[in-house]
Regions:
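Metallo-beta-lactamase
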Residues: 1-94, 98-110, 117, 122-191, 209-216, ...
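Core dinuclear metal-dependent hydrolase active-site scaffold
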Residues: 4-7, 46-50, 56, 65, ...
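Short glycine/proline- and acidic residue-enriched helix-loop micro-motifs
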Residues: 32-33, 69, 151-160, 232-242
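Active-site flanking residues adjacent to catalytic metal/cofactor-binding acidic residues
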Residues: 58, 105, 125-126, 194, ...
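Catalytic metal-binding/acid-base residues of hydrolase active sites
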Residues: 61-63, 108, 129, 193, ...
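Cap/insert and terminal regions of metallo-dependent hydrolase folds
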Residues: 75-87, 208-253
Length: 253
C-alpha cells in the first residue's frame, strides 16, 4: 500500500502577516526578512489521502464568498465551480460520495463547509474540539458558525443558519477521538492544541516518510524556522503563529 496526499485549495482568505501569521514578538525580526503587514490571501487547503482501502479527506474547506465576507474574513474568494470542495474533487475524478472518511483538524468555519454532500463518510474530530464547538465563548461564535450570529434571514445549510456539522444527517455521523489514534493503517492523528482548544494533526505514512497535515497550527513555513537573530536574542527556535487560544500549547505543538 502506497499512500499519497493531494492538496486541494478551497479558496482564499485575507490575512495580515504581522498580526496573523506571526506572534507580535516576532515583528522586528520578520520585517527584516521583507515581511510587511499588507493583507495577503492565504489559500485554504484541504488534503485528499489516496492509495489505501478507503478514500480520506482532511477538512472540507471554507464557505462560499458571500458568507465568508459577511460573517468571517473579507474579501475572501471561493470561485464557484472551481474552489468549492465538490468541484475540487470532481477535478481529480471523485464525488463527495466517494469519500469514506473526513478527518477534521478542527471545526472552524473555513474547514467544515458542504458536509451534507458527503453522504457516506464517517466524520472524525477531536473530542475536546467537538465539545468546545458547541459551547464556545462569544469571542468564538463566528469561528464556529453558531446560529446566534445569523442576520437577515441568511442560511448556511438547507433553509437554516446552522453550523454545518450540526445538520440533520451529518451530526449523527460524527465520531470523536482523543490522544493519539490510528484511524486506518498508515493514517493517524494526535492532539495539537493551541490554535483552538481541540486542534489535531493528521499523520500520513508515505513512501517518502511521514507527512503532517497540520491545519492551522502552522500558517506559513516561516513559523517553523526562526531567523538567527531571533534565536540569538529571544532564544526562539520557531516563529510562533499569531492566532491562538493558548500560546503555550501552540508553542509546544
Amino acid at each position: 500500500m502506497s499512500l499519497t496526499i493531494r492538496p486541494l485549495n478551497s479558496g482564499y482568505i485575507p490575512t495580515k502577516p504581522l498580526e496573523y501569521w506571526y506572534h507580535f514578538s516576532c515583528k522586528k525580526y520578520v520585517e527584516k526578512m521583507g515581511i510587511t503587514n499588507e493583507s495577503d490571501q492565504l489559500p485554504d487547503m484541504t488534503f485528499l489521502i489516496e492509495g489505501g482501502d478507503q478514500l480520506i479527506l482532511v477538512d472540507t474547506g471554507m464557505s462560499w464568498t458571500e458568507h465568508a465576507d459577511k460573517y468571517h474574513h473579507g474579501p475572501s474568494l471561493q470561485r464557484p465551480g472551481i474552489d468549492d470542495i465538490e468541484s475540487r474533487l470532481a477535478q481529480v475524478g471523485y464525488k463527495p460520495s466517494d469519500v469514506d472518511i473526513v478527518l477534521f483538524t478542527h471545526l472552524h468555519w473555513d474547514h467544515i463547509f458542504y458536509l451534507e454532500k458527503f453522504t457516506k463518510a464517517r466524520f472524525i474530530c477531536n473530542e475536546v474540539e467537538w465539545d468546545y464547538a458547541h459551547n464556545p465563548v462569544p469571542l468564538h461564535y463566528k469561528s464556529y458558525c453558531r446560529p446566534i450570529i445569523a442576520k437577515d434571514g441568511d442560511v448556511t445549510c438547507g433553509n437554516e443558519f446552522i453550523a454545518p456539522y450540526d445538520q440533520e444527517g451529518v451530526k449523527e455521523r460524527f465520531e470523536t477521538v482523543k490522544g493519539e489514534v490510528e484511524i486506518v493503517p498508515g493514517v493517524s492523528v494526535y492532539e495539537s492544541f493551541g490554535h483552538c482548544p481541540g486542534h489535531m494533526t493528521i499523520v500520513v505514512e508515505t513512501e517518502d516518510g511521514p507527512y503532517f497535515c497540520v491545519g492551522d497550527s502552522v500558517f506559513v513555513m516561516g513559523n517553523v524556522d526562526a531567523p538567527q537573530e531571533m534565536q540569538d536574542e529571544l532564544h526562539y527556535d520557531i516563529c510562533p503563529p499569531g492566532r491562538y487560544v493558548d500560546i503555550v500549547a501552540a508553542w509546544q505543538t
